[in-house]
UniProtKB/Swiss-Prot annotation:
GO terms for biological process: queuosine biosynthetic process; tRNA modification. Keywords: 4Fe-4S, Cytoplasm, Iron, Iron-sulfur, Metal-binding, Oxidoreductase, Queuosine biosynthesis, tRNA processing. It catalyses: epoxyqueuosine(34) in tRNA + AH2 = queuosine(34) in tRNA + A + H2O. This is Epoxyqueuosine reductase. It is found in: Cytoplasm. [4Fe-4S] cluster 2 binds at C203, C219, C246, C249. GO terms for cellular component: cytoplasm. [4Fe-4S] cluster 1 binds at C193, C196, C199, C253. Disruption phenotype: RNA from mutants accumulates epoxyqueuosine and lacks queuosine. Catalyzes the conversion of epoxyqueuosine (oQ) to queuosine (Q), which is a hypermodified base found in the wobble positions of tRNA(Asp), tRNA(Asn), tRNA(His) and tRNA(Tyr). NCBIfam families: tRNA epoxyqueuosine(34) reductase QueG (TIGR00276). Its main location: cytoplasm. It comes from Escherichia coli (strain K12).
């Protein structure tokens, strides 16, 4: 065991060790989330969590970290950048023949990577505090990570409900380490959104129903990742070519002009997932899907939902005979897929009959212009 440190020294060491482990920022807060409890309950009461039953099932436990690890006194909150080089946001979004995958999911699944780093951080603290009990969390337990990150000074909550940082925007993962030592806490930062509502107005489906409140049932990330059944028909045309997640509310945000590229090789895009041809993706067998998505966050939605999402994107593409052929080729595999294929075919035929060459989505066109002007490095 190393020489004991006083708590102020230990807090500084923890932040230093966190940076050495690859985190871009480390903050410390207490476990009091009592102010978040009524907001969480109101959100659940309005059914904004959709079919994510586990959110309601755990209830207020999410706002009580000390109940997850009895004796917890502090939460060490960390963030890690995930934006890859050559993100190709605009070039992918404006090409309806390509599939858009949320940029956090292009590389290796972040859960295990962050959890292992947090575990190492806990072990480093233990060298100076042998009686320490700790537990790492990365989307792996019912915990309100964003309010904790805000209290720990990592940023403020934007109107899209994500954490924003003045020097890094919002393209980063969050993680937590629960500890049972009374470390000095950090102070929250001043919010920086002001009267800006860009994220609310750009959302393709109007999922940000009021500042800081997202109705998951309308959110493309929820529809393409969490929803197990049929995607509501009225929302399908608004999804465009987004087949796994959506980044629009982040891309329009002025603070993401300061976004930082990741230094983690594991977050580099896998070629088959980066600006892929929709028709090629739709031809993947389940074996090919599992092979390409091994170690990826995408794998958990399964092959069926993957095809469902792509069918919607093909339905949103301009008329093309090869799209019709591709859609027809997968009929009869599963009722859920058949329903989305039938819708996509109807969309294609309607465009053919009306001689529609290009589908106009004003919000997407505006977003592409903003990206090309404000985020040229990542366009």
């Amino acid at each position: 065991m190393s020489e004991p440190l006083d708590l102020n020294q230990l807090a500084q060491k923890i932040k230093q060790w966190g940076l050495e482990l690859g985190f871009q920022q480390v903050g410390i807060t207490d476990t009091d989330l009592s102010e978040s409890e009524p907001k969480l309950q109101a959100w659940l009461d309005k059914q904004y969590h959709g079919e994510m039953d586990w959110m309601a099932r755990h209830g207020m436990l999410r706002a009580r970290p000390h109940e997850l690890l009895p004796g917890t006194l502090r939460v060490i909150s960390v963030r890690m950048n995930y934006l890859p080089a050559n993100a190709a946001f605009a070039s992918t979004l404006k090409n309806p023949k390509l599939g858009y995958v949320s940029r956090y999911a292009l590389g290796r699944d972040y859960h295990k990577l962050l959890r292992n780093r947090l575990k190492k951080l806990g072990e480093m603290i233990q060298q100076h505090c042998v009686s320490l009990n700790f537990r790492p969390f990365v989307d792996s337990a019912p915990i309100l990570e964003r309010p904790l990150a805000e209290k720990a000074g990592l940023g403020w909550t934007g109107k899209h409900s994500l954490i924003l940082n003045r020097e890094a925007g919002s393209f980063f993962f969050l993680g937590e380490l629960l500890v049972d030592i009374p470390l000095p806490v950090d102070q929250p930062v001043e919010e920086g959104c002001g009267k800006c509502v860009a994220c609310m107005t750009i959302c393709p489906t109007g999922a940000i129903v009021e500042p800081y409140t997202v109705d998951a049932r309308r959110c493309i990330s929820y529809l393409t990742i969490e929803l197990e059944g049929a995607i509501p028909e009225e929302l399908r045309p608004l999804m465009g070519n987004r087949i796994y997640g959506c980044d629009d509310c982040q891309l329009i945000c002025p603070w993401n002009r300061y976004s930082q590229l990741t230094t983690e090789e594991d977050f580099s895009p896998r070629k088959p997932l980066h600006a892929p041809e929709l028709i090629e993706l739709f031809a993947w067998s389940e074996e090919k899907f599992l092979k390409v998505t091994e170690g990826s966050a995408i794998r958990r939605i399964g092959h069926l939902r993957w095809l469902r999402n792509i069918a919607v994107a093909l339905g949103n593409a301009p008329w093309d005979e090869t799209i019709l052929t591709a859609l027809e080729s997968r009929k009869g595999e599963h009722p859920l897929l058949d329903e989305h294929i039938a819708w996509a075919i109807a969309q294609q035929i309607e465009r053919r009959n009306a001689c529609i060459v290009e589908v106009q989505l004003p919000k997407k066109q505006r977003l592409v212009r903003v990206i090309e002007k404000g985020l040229p490095r990542d366009a």
